[in-house]
Amino acid sequence: NLFSVIVSLIFLYIINKTLTLYLVCTLPILIIVILPIGNIMKRVSSKSQEATAKLSSYYSNRLSTIKLIKTLSTYNIEKIKNYTLLKNIFDIELHKIKVLSFFEPIMNLILFINIFGILFLGYYLMENNMMKSGDMFAYVLYLFQIINPIVSITSYWTEVQRAIGSSDRILKINKEPEEVLTIKTTYNNFVQKMEINDLNFTKDNKQIINSISLDLHKGYIYNIIGESGCGKSTLLNILAGLNTEYTGNIYLDKLDKSQFSKYEWRNLFSYITQD
């Protein structure tokens, strides 16, 4: 398409320089319109990808325990969360459709104005004997050959922006640094005691774990009981070193968790799922 545009512009310039210069001067108007629309599509696609990821995460965490959720008092709360997530995706997709519905008419309007301006200028040149009618006819034929490639290029630009917006999170994940599995200390003793001191965890401005302090001794079995979403799995993930976004201190036989590398700490734990 780009090659077709360049070749057509060369032929148009050969036929008439004045009309071609006018056409080239009006192309930036098209670019000015396309760039904001492309950026809007990028933002909308990024929001759509994020909303879909949240919905997938929600379902993957809830469907495995759906029977338990149905028997809890939080069932209606989960229904509201589910509806909110679905409604969010619907609103984002609706916004995307609205943007696309405006894109094509705006493109056609700009092209129509350009063609009308070229015809008007061509008529003026013919009236003043600065251009022959045959040249004008040939110019119009080549002009219509350039329209479809320009439309295809603009559509390609918006699709590229949509793709960038959709894959934005994936690109950010790929840029995240890998875990450095180094050894800080050698701990060969059997664990006798774990101390949890003033542990807090917040997610999305919501306090999940609030100032928990525990002493866990060897040889005892501890049950963590609570309603769905109260932070049971989060606490286990923190203790196993799978979640580091918390405040507070965790000690293993008086040794602070920070003295261990992630690799060493995780080797001290066995995580057995309910399944």
UniProtKB/Swiss-Prot annotation:
The protein's matches in Gene3D superfamilies, at most eight in alphabetical order, are given as: ABC transporter type 1, transmembrane domain, P-loop containing nucleotide triphosphate hydrolases
- Asked if the keyword Cell membrane belongs to this entry, the reply reads yes
Classification via SUPFAM superfamilies: ABC transporter transmembrane region, P-loop containing nucleoside triphosphate hydrolases
Which species does this protein come from? Staphylococcus epidermidis
Any one GO MF annotation of this record: ABC-type oligopeptide transporter activity
Pfam families hit by this protein:
ABC_membrane, ABC_tran
Subcellular localization, per the record? Cell membrane
Sequence intervals crossing the membrane = 21-41, 106-126, 137-157
Keyword entries, A-Z: Cell membrane, Membrane, Plasmid, Transmembrane, Transmembrane helix
State if Disulfide bond is listed as a keyword: no
PROSITE patterns from the UniProt entry: ABC_TM1F (PS50929)
- Where does the ABC transmembrane type-1 domain lie? 1-162
Name of the molecule in the record: Uncharacterized protein in epiA 5'region
- Topology versus the membrane, per the UniProt entry? Multi-pass membrane protein
Which residues pair up as cystines?
Answer: none
Q: Please provide one cellular component term from the Gene Ontology annotations of this protein.
A: plasma membrane
Q: Which domain of life is it from?
A: Bacteria
